[in-house]
A protein has these predicted regions:
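Metabolite-binding pocket within alpha/beta catalytic cores that recognizes anionic/polar moieties
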Residues: 21-192
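A short, acidic, amphipathic alpha-helical segment used as a generic capping/interface helix at domain edges
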Residues: 237-247, 253, 257-263
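Glycine-rich beta-alpha junction loops
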Residues: 136, 153, 214-221, 259, ...
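His/Asp/Glu-rich mid-to-C-terminal helical/loop segments that flank catalytic regions of hydrolases
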Residues: 280-307
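Generic structural signal for well-ordered, non-membrane alpha-helical segments
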Residues: 50, 54-57, 93-100, 104, ...
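Short, often N-terminal, low-complexity regions
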Residues: 1-3, 8, 14-16
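Active-site rim beta-loop-alpha module in soluble metabolic enzymes
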Residues: 174-245
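Zn-dependent metallopeptidase/amidohydrolase metal-coordination segment
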Residues: 258-290
Length: 307
């Protein structure tokens, strides 16, 4: 074999390796859908509601005037339809920022990557993403059943640290102030803070308390709960409750918003989280029948997204 033939063979082999790598970067199912969400381009609307519970997707879908897409895989259930002539998708993410990493990246790929070539489209689109969820209140004055609009999301999870060039979208002063207040240990991921989309916050926050939200990487010790295992800091919740930043309080715990806000900023999407307080961690009050409150919040979001 000549030198030219060897070079050509090597080039072809190299291209095959590159293509194989790309296939493991953006995994496509045999039907052309994305690996986890099992969605095709065109299955989603530009306005999207994210919930954790797949059952909550169906609850909100019942309010739609019509439905054109119903698809599910694992914990990811998607319904796309119309409300007041506005197309809206409702998608369940499951629990946690790790799942949000999947959902946000695959939603973005559906509108901003040519799935056949793996190339970014010439004119990227911006999605409107609203998370509707439940939450634990961290201030005594927040009654169960009330709504919270997340002005800033603080991540204890570390997901955003795995992405290059994310620093521009962070509120460093807020994160550094909280780290100092909590005497945050070096062995944990450094907290990061990201703002909500200002336009969505103004449009959708009527009737809600505005506050800073902490997204944790777990439900028990990461939120100060004790069962058989003790959390590393028994005063964590008290110290979070007493924290102030430019007159603002940390109002609640949940497990998704930091990644939603951070990835949305990096991918040029608009994001907001609205939650129903179902437990007040200060007073110990718990709302067992919280579904009517979630339904009320969802109706409000649908009305505002369609106006």
């Amino acid at each position: 074999m000549s030198t030219d033939e060897l070079q050509l063979t090597f080039f072809v082999f190299l291209q095959l390796i590159i293509r194989a790598m790309k296939k493991t970067e953006l995994i496509i199912n045999p039907d052309g859908s994305l690996f986890h969400l099992h969605l095709l381009p065109g299955d989603i609307a530009e306005k999207i509601i994210i919930v954790g519970d797949p059952g909550r997707v169906e609850m909100i879908a019942e309010m739609l005037d019509s439905v054109r897409v119903r698809k599910s895989n694992r914990e990811f259930y998607t319904v796309t339809g119309t409300f007041r002539e506005t197309e809206i998708s409702i998608i369940s993410s499951g629990i946690g920022t790790d799942n949000i990493d999947i959902v946000l990246n695959e939603l973005d790929a559906l509108v901003n990557i040519d799935l056949a070539t793996g190339m970014t489209v010439e004119e990227p689109r911006s999605l409107t993403i609203v998370r509707i969820g439940t939450t634990g209140g961290l201030q005594a004055e927040l009654p169960v059943g009330s709504f919270i609009a997340t002005t800033k999301a603080i991540g204890f999870d570390g997901v955003l640290h795995f992405y290059e060039g994310y620093e521009w979208c962070l509120d460093h002063m807020l994160a550094d102030s909280l780290v100092a207040h909590l005497e945050w240990p070096d062995l944990l991921a450094y907290p990061y803070a990201v703002d909500a989309d200002a336009g969505l916050l103004e449009k959708l926050s009527a009737g809600a308390t505005k506050g800073i939200t902490i997204s944790t990487p777990g439900f028990y010790a990461p939120q100060g709960r004790r069962l058989r295992l003790e959390p590393f800091d028994n005063e964590l919740n008290d110290n979070i409750t007493s924290f102030r930043f430019k007159g603002q309080k940390i109002t609640n715990y949940e497990m998704e918003s930091s990644a939603i806000y951070g990835l949305s900023k990096l991918l040029n999407h608009k994001a907001l989280t609205l939650c129903v307080v179902i437990a007040n961690r200060v007073t110990g009050e718990f709302l067992a029948d919280y579904k009517p409150a979630v339904r009320k919040l969802a109706a409000h979001v649908l009305e505002e997204l369609s106006s």
